[in-house]
């Protein structure tokens, strides 16, 4: 905050002297900080601290530190005028809340950056390992196995089973012939039984004929 370089004189009075209705001297200690157009600032400071206390404080402070002290005093008085309850304390609390909010947002942003970096590294690793994986997949396709999928997407094992079934339909296997053997054996047995019955009948006829002749 820039401070006025106004110096007291006989014709014009500073805001402090004007408020006190007294003549502003050339060496007025308050004229530098409360010029003629700084009535509101003086009223705020006077209401909070009192003009006599401000004058005593300035006299006790070194001249090189007076500007900084009055800047703080005027700022504190204006803050109390805007917020009679909180004053500067409320301003400090608001600033702390803003700092904490910004700090939290900064931490979240850093976490997002770390996450993006880790994802980028993972994608880079996958791209580096992709050719090796493709080669290994092609080598698996070239192996003589029964449980892999060919280029057309057909199951090699199913194709072999279909071919075997077609061959069985065209050329009956030994297993089918073996299944038919019981039927053939039963037919042979029946024929043998018929032959034995015929023999028995012939023998009976011969016996009967011989008995009749006798």
UniProtKB/Swiss-Prot annotation:
<dbReference type="InterPro" id="IPR004883">
    <property type="entry name" value="LOB"/>
</dbReference>
<dbReference type="Pfam" id="PF03195">
    <property type="entry name" value="LOB"/>
</dbReference>
<protein>
    <recommendedName>
        <fullName>LOB domain-containing protein 7</fullName>
    </recommendedName>
</protein>
<comment type="similarity">
    <text>Belongs to the LOB domain-containing protein family.</text>
</comment>
<feature type="domain" description="LOB">
    <location>
        <begin position="12"/>
        <end position="113"/>
    </location>
</feature>
